[in-house]
Amino acid sequence: MNNNHVYDMLVVGGGPGGYTAALYAARAGLDTIVLEKLSAGGQMALTEQIDNYPGFEDGIDGFSLAEKMQKQAERFGVRSEYAEVLRMDLTAVPKLVETSEGIFRGKTVVLATGADPRTLGVAGEAELLGRGVAYCAACDGMFYKGKTVVVVGGGNSAAADALLLSRVAKKVILVHRRDTLRATKIYHEPLSQAENVEFRWNSVVSALLSGDRLTGVRLRDTVTGEESVVDCDGVFVSVGRQPATALAVGQLALDDGGYIVAGETTETSIPGVYAVGDVRTKPLRQVVTAVADGAVAVHMAEKYIAENR
């Protein structure tokens, strides 16, 4: 596809932030298309159970919630196009997004490309997702109430996850490849005082042990090379996230972690371009915060379009 049609809004990414932006845009009368590589929902679609999104008293699985969001947006005229984005020219007028299915042009662009959790890279990790392997303590911690869990990592996210889990789990084992945490000092004292938090220094996970679910991990000492087995019910991988911002490099301002610099207005360093959800700089990355970003982005985009007619 390569025509001269200009959309009011191009939404890149079909996660909760992207489809909320599309919904609000369509309801505001903006001609809107969502460009998504695979399927709606992003990381949310891989979540087995979501209990912290308002309105679902019994919870809902991520795939079903994603499907509902997509259908709701499309009911108001949003078009969905499944295509891989290959190139973007965000300073062009109109703005240009080249995909595997052709070129799309828009007055504004909402980037909702998300951030993928970095993985352990060990066998069986993907297969055990939702069956003992998790990447979000705030999302899945309550499933491990009274159980033993391992947290892998040594930065702020790992420390925060270990503290959060210490309030619900019977035992938390924090595994770090170095002999001290990289997390800021504010976490050190609370962790050392938590009676149910144990540290395994100079250790990495070399294998996941499982039957139908995770049953434990094998650890390798990075100094001696010795291996040991730790029985546990769950592993929370907290070794950072990788924002999907490769195509924004050289165009938008990014922070040291590769996230798009955008505040609560979701405005980026280029007028008419907005970043929503996990891809932008923010203190909390959850479905509900991504949804809020989507609504704010459209509010700002409407003002931009009105001022640049």
Each PLM stretch: what is its role?
Residues 119-120, 159-160, 182, 227, ...:
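Glycine/Thr-rich phosphate-binding loops of Rossmann-like dinucleotide-binding domains
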Residues 6, 121, 127-143, 239-289, ...:
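FAD-site-proximal beta/loop scaffold in flavoenzymes
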Residues 3, 7-76, 159-184, 255:
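Beta1-alpha1 glycine-rich phosphate/pyrophosphate-binding loop at the start
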Residues 80-143, 154:
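Glycine/small-residue-rich loop that forms an oxyanion/phosphate-binding "nest" at active or ligand-binding sites
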Residues 14, 113-114, 239-240:
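Glycine-rich, N-terminal phosphate-binding loop of Rossmann-like dinucleotide-binding domains
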Residues 73-93, 97-98, 103-104, 166-263, ...:
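A Rossmann-like FAD-binding core segment of flavoenzymes
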